[in-house]
Protein backbone atom coordinates (compact mmCIF):
# COMPACT_ATOMS: atom_id res chain seq x y z
CA UNK A 1 0.00 0.00 0.00
CA UNK A 2 1.49 3.31 -1.10
CA UNK A 3 0.52 6.24 1.10
CA UNK A 4 1.49 9.18 -1.05
CA UNK A 5 -0.28 12.24 -2.39
CA UNK A 6 0.26 15.23 -4.63
CA UNK A 7 -1.80 18.41 -4.32
CA UNK A 8 -1.66 21.44 -6.57
CA UNK A 9 -3.59 24.50 -5.45
CA UNK A 10 -3.75 27.80 -7.26
CA UNK A 11 -5.56 31.04 -6.40
CA UNK A 12 -5.05 34.68 -7.27
CA UNK A 13 -2.83 34.88 -4.17
CA UNK A 14 -0.61 31.81 -4.47
CA UNK A 15 0.40 28.72 -6.40
CA UNK A 16 1.18 25.71 -4.21
CA UNK A 17 2.54 22.22 -4.88
CA UNK A 18 2.70 19.72 -2.02
CA UNK A 19 3.84 16.09 -2.23
CA UNK A 20 3.90 13.73 0.75
CA UNK A 21 4.91 10.16 1.49
CA UNK A 22 3.68 9.05 4.91
CA UNK A 23 6.10 6.12 4.95
CA UNK A 24 9.19 8.15 4.22
CA UNK A 25 12.32 8.98 6.16
CA UNK A 26 11.82 12.71 6.66
CA UNK A 27 13.37 13.86 3.39
CA UNK A 28 12.35 17.40 2.55
CA UNK A 29 12.47 19.96 -0.24
CA UNK A 30 10.64 23.03 1.03
CA UNK A 31 10.49 26.49 -0.49
CA UNK A 32 7.67 28.89 0.38
CA UNK A 33 9.44 32.25 0.21
CA UNK A 34 9.01 32.61 3.99
CA UNK A 35 12.28 31.45 5.50
CA UNK A 36 11.10 30.74 9.03
CA UNK A 37 8.10 28.78 7.74
CA UNK A 38 10.43 26.68 5.59
CA UNK A 39 12.37 25.90 8.77
CA UNK A 40 9.18 24.82 10.58
CA UNK A 41 7.90 22.63 7.73
CA UNK A 42 11.32 21.02 7.48
CA UNK A 43 11.16 20.23 11.20
CA UNK A 44 7.69 18.75 10.73
CA UNK A 45 8.88 16.48 7.91
CA UNK A 46 11.95 15.34 9.80
CA UNK A 47 10.18 14.47 13.03
CA UNK A 48 7.04 13.02 11.43
CA UNK A 49 9.25 10.89 9.13
CA UNK A 50 7.14 12.16 6.24
CA UNK A 51 8.88 12.84 2.94
CA UNK A 52 7.72 16.33 2.04
CA UNK A 53 8.01 18.52 -1.03
CA UNK A 54 6.58 22.04 -0.87
CA UNK A 55 6.90 24.63 -3.62
CA UNK A 56 4.91 27.81 -3.02
CA UNK A 57 4.90 31.00 -5.03
CA UNK A 58 2.80 33.52 -3.14
CA UNK A 59 2.15 37.24 -2.86
CA UNK A 60 4.93 37.76 -0.33
CA UNK A 61 5.28 41.36 -1.50
CA UNK A 62 2.15 41.94 0.61
CA UNK A 63 3.02 39.78 3.62
CA UNK A 64 3.38 36.12 4.59
CA UNK A 65 -0.25 35.42 5.46
CA UNK A 66 -1.65 34.09 2.17
CA UNK A 67 1.48 32.05 1.45
CA UNK A 68 1.53 30.43 4.88
CA UNK A 69 -2.22 29.76 4.94
CA UNK A 70 -2.47 28.35 1.42
CA UNK A 71 0.51 26.07 1.99
CA UNK A 72 -1.07 24.74 5.19
CA UNK A 73 -4.36 24.11 3.38
CA UNK A 74 -2.60 22.13 0.64
CA UNK A 75 -0.56 20.20 3.22
CA UNK A 76 -3.71 19.21 5.09
CA UNK A 77 -5.33 18.09 1.83
CA UNK A 78 -2.26 16.05 0.92
CA UNK A 79 -2.13 14.33 4.31
CA UNK A 80 -5.82 13.45 4.06
CA UNK A 81 -5.42 12.07 0.53
CA UNK A 82 -2.35 10.02 1.46
CA UNK A 83 -4.18 8.42 4.40
CA UNK A 84 -6.86 6.97 2.12
CA UNK A 85 -9.47 5.02 4.10
CA UNK A 86 -7.12 4.95 7.14
CA UNK A 87 -7.16 1.18 7.29
CA UNK A 88 -4.60 -0.25 9.71
CA UNK A 89 -3.47 3.00 11.33
CA UNK A 90 -3.08 3.53 15.06
CA UNK A 91 -5.34 6.60 14.76
CA UNK A 92 -4.24 8.33 17.99
CA UNK A 93 -0.96 10.06 18.73
CA UNK A 94 0.23 11.95 21.81
CA UNK A 95 3.64 13.61 22.13
CA UNK A 96 5.20 15.97 24.64
CA UNK A 97 8.34 17.61 23.28
CA UNK A 98 10.88 19.97 24.88
CA UNK A 99 13.22 22.49 23.29
CA UNK A 100 15.34 23.98 26.04
CA UNK A 101 12.89 26.04 28.13
CA UNK A 102 9.88 25.37 25.86
CA UNK A 103 7.57 22.40 26.35
CA UNK A 104 4.59 21.47 24.17
CA UNK A 105 2.06 18.65 24.16
CA UNK A 106 0.28 17.72 20.92
CA UNK A 107 -2.47 15.13 20.58
CA UNK A 108 -3.87 13.87 17.27
CA UNK A 109 -6.96 11.82 16.47
CA UNK A 110 -7.26 10.91 12.79
CA UNK A 111 -11.01 10.81 13.27
CA UNK A 112 -12.33 12.28 10.03
CA UNK A 113 -13.79 15.11 12.13
CA UNK A 114 -11.85 18.37 11.80
CA UNK A 115 -11.12 20.20 15.04
CA UNK A 116 -8.27 22.23 16.49
CA UNK A 117 -7.71 23.43 20.04
CA UNK A 118 -4.64 25.62 20.49
CA UNK A 119 -3.80 26.99 23.94
CA UNK A 120 -1.04 28.19 26.23
CA UNK A 121 1.09 30.57 24.19
CA UNK A 122 2.45 33.39 26.37
CA UNK A 123 0.93 36.84 26.08
CA UNK A 124 2.33 38.72 23.11
CA UNK A 125 3.50 35.63 21.21
CA UNK A 126 1.02 36.37 18.43
CA UNK A 127 2.71 39.71 17.69
CA UNK A 128 6.27 38.40 17.45
CA UNK A 129 7.97 38.58 14.05
CA UNK A 130 10.29 35.66 13.35
CA UNK A 131 12.85 35.01 10.64
CA UNK A 132 15.85 36.67 9.11
CA UNK A 133 14.25 37.19 5.70
CA UNK A 134 11.37 39.26 4.37
CA UNK A 135 8.50 38.69 4.81
CA UNK A 136 8.67 37.80 8.48
CA UNK A 137 6.62 35.01 10.01
CA UNK A 138 4.13 36.52 12.47
CA UNK A 139 3.52 34.54 15.66
CA UNK A 140 -0.25 34.57 15.14
CA UNK A 141 0.22 32.40 12.05
CA UNK A 142 1.12 29.33 14.12
CA UNK A 143 -2.41 28.70 15.35
CA UNK A 144 -3.72 29.45 11.87
CA UNK A 145 -1.37 26.86 10.34
CA UNK A 146 -2.50 24.10 12.68
CA UNK A 147 -6.17 24.99 12.22
CA UNK A 148 -5.76 24.85 8.44
CA UNK A 149 -3.90 21.54 8.47
CA UNK A 150 -6.37 19.93 10.88
CA UNK A 151 -9.49 21.16 9.07
CA UNK A 152 -8.29 20.19 5.61
CA UNK A 153 -6.66 17.00 6.86
CA UNK A 154 -9.88 15.99 8.64
CA UNK A 155 -8.35 15.21 12.01
CA UNK A 156 -8.66 16.52 15.55
CA UNK A 157 -5.61 18.31 16.90
CA UNK A 158 -4.92 19.64 20.38
CA UNK A 159 -1.79 21.73 20.95
CA UNK A 160 -0.89 22.92 24.46
CA UNK A 161 2.10 25.14 25.11
CA UNK A 162 3.11 24.15 28.64
CA UNK A 163 6.20 26.35 28.99
CA UNK A 164 8.35 28.68 26.95
CA UNK A 165 10.08 32.05 26.86
CA UNK A 166 11.98 32.28 23.56
CA UNK A 167 9.47 32.90 20.71
CA UNK A 168 11.42 30.82 18.17
CA UNK A 169 11.54 27.86 20.57
CA UNK A 170 7.82 28.16 21.33
CA UNK A 171 6.87 27.86 17.65
CA UNK A 172 9.44 25.22 16.75
CA UNK A 173 8.47 22.99 19.67
CA UNK A 174 4.85 23.10 18.52
CA UNK A 175 5.76 21.91 15.04
CA UNK A 176 7.95 19.14 16.43
CA UNK A 177 5.30 17.98 18.91
CA UNK A 178 2.61 17.92 16.23
CA UNK A 179 5.00 15.99 13.98
CA UNK A 180 5.68 13.33 16.59
CA UNK A 181 2.01 12.96 17.48
CA UNK A 182 1.05 12.72 13.80
CA UNK A 183 3.80 10.17 13.19
CA UNK A 184 2.36 7.91 15.90
CA UNK A 185 -1.24 8.42 14.77
CA UNK A 186 -0.63 7.42 11.14
CA UNK A 187 1.76 4.57 11.93
CA UNK A 188 0.52 1.18 10.78
CA UNK A 189 -0.45 -1.22 13.58
CA UNK A 190 0.25 -4.84 12.60
CA UNK A 191 -2.63 -6.00 14.82
CA UNK A 192 -5.16 -3.61 13.24
CA UNK A 193 -6.51 -5.23 10.09
CA UNK A 194 -9.40 -2.86 9.53
CA UNK A 195 -10.41 0.72 10.10
CA UNK A 196 -9.84 1.70 13.76
CA UNK A 197 -13.39 2.74 14.59
CA UNK A 198 -16.48 0.98 15.91
CA UNK A 199 -18.37 2.74 13.11
CA UNK A 200 -16.27 1.05 10.44
CA UNK A 201 -15.29 4.34 8.84
CA UNK A 202 -13.21 7.41 9.64
UniProtKB/Swiss-Prot annotation:
It catalyses: D-erythro-1-(imidazol-4-yl)glycerol 3-phosphate = 3-(imidazol-4-yl)-2-oxopropyl phosphate + H2O. InterPro entries: IGPD_sf (IPR038494), ImidazoleglycerolP_deHydtase (IPR000807), ImidazoleglycerP_deHydtase_CS (IPR020565), Ribosomal_Su5_D2-typ_SF (IPR020568). One of its GO terms (cellular component) is cytoplasm. It is found in: Cytoplasm. One of its GO terms (biological process) is L-histidine biosynthetic process. It is an enzyme of class 4 (lyase). One of its GO terms (molecular function) is imidazoleglycerol-phosphate dehydratase activity. Keywords: Amino-acid biosynthesis, Cytoplasm, Histidine biosynthesis, Lyase. Its EC number is 4.2.1.19. Disulfide bonds: none annotated. Pathway: Amino-acid biosynthesis; L-histidine biosynthesis; L-histidine from 5-phospho-alpha-D-ribose 1-diphosphate: step 6/9. NCBIfam families: PRK00951.1-6 (NF002110), PRK00951.2-1 (NF002111), PRK00951.2-4 (NF002114). Belongs to the imidazoleglycerol-phosphate dehydratase family. PANTHER family: IMIDAZOLEGLYCEROL-PHOSPHATE DEHYDRATASE (PTHR23133:SF2), IMIDAZOLEGLYCEROL-PHOSPHATE DEHYDRATASE HIS7 (PTHR23133). HAMAP family: HisB. This is Imidazoleglycerol-phosphate dehydratase. It comes from Nocardioides sp. (strain ATCC BAA-499 / JS614).
Amino acid sequence: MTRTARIERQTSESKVLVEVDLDGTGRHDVSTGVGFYDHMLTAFARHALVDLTVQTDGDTHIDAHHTVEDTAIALGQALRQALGDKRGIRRFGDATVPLDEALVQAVVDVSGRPYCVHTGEPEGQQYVQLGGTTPAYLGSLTQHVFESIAFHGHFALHVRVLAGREPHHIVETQFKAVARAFRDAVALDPRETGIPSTKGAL
